[in-house]
């Protein structure tokens, strides 16, 4: 009887593996690639839309208006009592700033500025959802390509347990450092603005204390938003894991339906919680977590159905079975996932540096403006640019499953084709989205969704938006390098490619453009830092990846890399087990 049961299990697994292989081995490689990329773009788009909708709802509904007449967030929100017991109201600041001919800030500026400084941390949160899941999906695809049943079980068990532990630990770390990070971003060197004010005069003193009040409230609101997302993002790591692993098994339809539905629920709860509670920005974060939770529940139910149908390798009983957790696969999963994490984390840090010094350079070049003027502008621009950037990254997520499977089959010819197909698709897609967001929907977004008021502010916002969006095209063109290196387990090269934009090219570009902007008294040279950085990154990544894409075998045999070393070690340690069974 046990023999029959084992034979049935083996037969069902063989049928499942054959079914998965057929999904990947269609001769029309470009069509297969599109089949994987399009759902990934949609999922990445809707994942970014979570944050985008939150930020729109924050801008439109948090502040008091006809849409939310009962809100506590109006210009009187700035009123406070100082340490000496003196009461100050917003009208005092308005009078002082008008007398000093300094454009005053208002409640909308505060909300946008809070969004702006929280953006780098939300990017890190997105990065952490990929830290384990991307390496797990890579190894899972490779195991499926080889048809190695034992490795499939070991990768699944190791990745699941690691994802739980790492996501909880990193969540605690982010919550611990968030307040310090946000305070630094809000401050910049904003105190330098006081140098141009006579703080001994009444008007100068009033403006200075309201600048401090603005920063205090900016950090307070951004913190409440970030704490909730950072504290509960473990749920989203499971969503990412289920999506990538189901995609690795060749499924597309159901996993592409869940994110849009969750987003609709997110919008509903955004409205209800922001409109009918006084939680402000925090309400939007709660709505996002509700959307995450419902998505996770849907994925789990779907996976249970697949398990009962014997249509998936993602069986929960295999997770804690003795011998399935493999420390060597743990190292590979983390090392491969670190490339995606490094990319997003480095971009987050570089964006934080950019945002912090934006205050400084505004003070130096345009001292007649509030120090947080351009930071507030980016509070409207950043959600739009992030929406485009995140959807562009869906290209690499989709193609990586196919590329990893081909690597498991040692099909290097198809890997080279994928390397060239991806930038072709990426350029077409990113160019269309650039024109749509930069010249088609720009005013609709800026005026109707982000409350940009005044013709001058609209002109500045449009210019900043179009400059910022340029980077998306070149990021899309350069992503094939990281795709190639991660999928073929060239971990060292993957790290270099992923750190190119956030570190290697950013440092020289930042210092050059920062000083050039000050020397020429042109703040837009500073704003061009991100696009120029993306262009140089594209050039650098193509230089290091093109030779590798066409001479894979030679590079594997002649070039040392930690990924290939670990892979060879795994194969050596596994062979004795196979012989023992024989």
Curated annotation (Swiss-Prot):
<feature type="transmembrane region" description="Helical">
    <location>
        <begin position="287"/>
        <end position="307"/>
    </location>
</feature>
<feature type="transmembrane region" description="Helical">
    <location>
        <begin position="432"/>
        <end position="452"/>
    </location>
</feature>
<dbReference type="InterPro" id="IPR051327">
    <property type="entry name" value="MATE_MepA_subfamily"/>
</dbReference>
<feature type="transmembrane region" description="Helical">
    <location>
        <begin position="254"/>
        <end position="274"/>
    </location>
</feature>
<feature type="transmembrane region" description="Helical">
    <location>
        <begin position="523"/>
        <end position="543"/>
    </location>
</feature>
<dbReference type="Pfam" id="PF01554">
    <property type="entry name" value="MatE"/>
</dbReference>
<protein>
    <recommendedName>
        <fullName>Uncharacterized protein MG447 homolog MYCGA2290</fullName>
    </recommendedName>
</protein>
<feature type="transmembrane region" description="Helical">
    <location>
        <begin position="225"/>
        <end position="245"/>
    </location>
</feature>
<feature type="transmembrane region" description="Helical">
    <location>
        <begin position="329"/>
        <end position="349"/>
    </location>
</feature>
<dbReference type="GO" id="GO:0042910">
    <property type="term" value="F:xenobiotic transmembrane transporter activity"/>
</dbReference>
<keyword id="KW-1133">Transmembrane helix</keyword>
<feature type="transmembrane region" description="Helical">
    <location>
        <begin position="491"/>
        <end position="511"/>
    </location>
</feature>
<feature type="transmembrane region" description="Helical">
    <location>
        <begin position="458"/>
        <end position="478"/>
    </location>
</feature>
<keyword id="KW-0472">Membrane</keyword>
<dbReference type="GO" id="GO:0005886">
    <property type="term" value="C:plasma membrane"/>
</dbReference>
<feature type="transmembrane region" description="Helical">
    <location>
        <begin position="29"/>
        <end position="49"/>
    </location>
</feature>
<dbReference type="InterPro" id="IPR002528">
    <property type="entry name" value="MATE_fam"/>
</dbReference>
<feature type="transmembrane region" description="Helical">
    <location>
        <begin position="155"/>
        <end position="175"/>
    </location>
</feature>
<dbReference type="GO" id="GO:0015297">
    <property type="term" value="F:antiporter activity"/>
</dbReference>
<keyword id="KW-0812">Transmembrane</keyword>
<keyword id="KW-1003">Cell membrane</keyword>
<feature type="transmembrane region" description="Helical">
    <location>
        <begin position="376"/>
        <end position="396"/>
    </location>
</feature>
<feature type="transmembrane region" description="Helical">
    <location>
        <begin position="117"/>
        <end position="137"/>
    </location>
</feature>
